[in-house]
């Protein structure tokens, strides 16, 4: 919606022309349908989409609109009805049985693996384990001393578990309840807010246990270590799919996947084929993430640098 607002702020501009000439890429053909790519509220998702936007606009000449979507349900319903075209990073462990039904009926198409592998989990800085080695595994978090160590003014007698965005796929409240841990979940609200809290805690050498994931630049920067939770089981995975509240294990390793509207292949077959071939590996993400996640560089600029450096990679996605 932003392009429509800009001409109003600059009366001398030509309102009708501005959206088609969006700064992005030269060679966009405004007569082609707009491709609506979904971005989720975490850094790697943004970078994936910016890379795709850059290449689609400059080589396939479709205008691309990036739409922020925070909830899986809205993401799947949008692709199913054709109002959204594709998402490039889905974590399968967070897909419910109800959402899988969209794949089953064909209204949403599974268009292959992204190429990166992710893992959500509980993380603490190494200095926390150096002082409290029992916290390397979940059993240490059942002890009353853990509640004291991680307690804050807001959490009272309970320890604070720092979560991030409430819209993320997460089972931490269930894990805490089902494993009888004296903790409560508090949400920072966003990935940057969690980084800010982690930075403050680390600078002061204060304990923090948090929801986090790989690949991210913060793991290396803050020397984060993953806590060993109970092993993933089929029963636990079934509980996640059914949303029955019984989750009591670690998060599984996620081979990240892509999905598209069932209508996209007809709408833009060349874009559909490109997105099927589109591949961003874990190493690719880790190459881009520090500049965006840590340094705060513009994600479109970070993506453009990656595109400029890797034409040998992405040119094969167009063939």
Regions found by a protein language model. Give the residues of each.
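Immediate post-signal peptide segment of exported/extracytoplasmic ligand-binding proteins
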Residues: 2-36, 150-158, 312-319
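Short, polar/charged alpha-helical segment
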Residues: 22-26, 43-62, 174-176
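An extracytoplasmic/periplasmic, membrane-proximal ligand-sensing/linker region
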Residues: 32, 44, 168-184, 188-205, ...
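Ligand-binding pocket segment of bilobal, Venus flytrap-like solute-binding proteins
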Residues: 76-78, 84-91, 160-238
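A bilobed periplasmic-binding-protein/Venus flytrap-type ligand-binding module shared by bacterial periplasmic
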Residues: 119-130, 254-267, 288-291
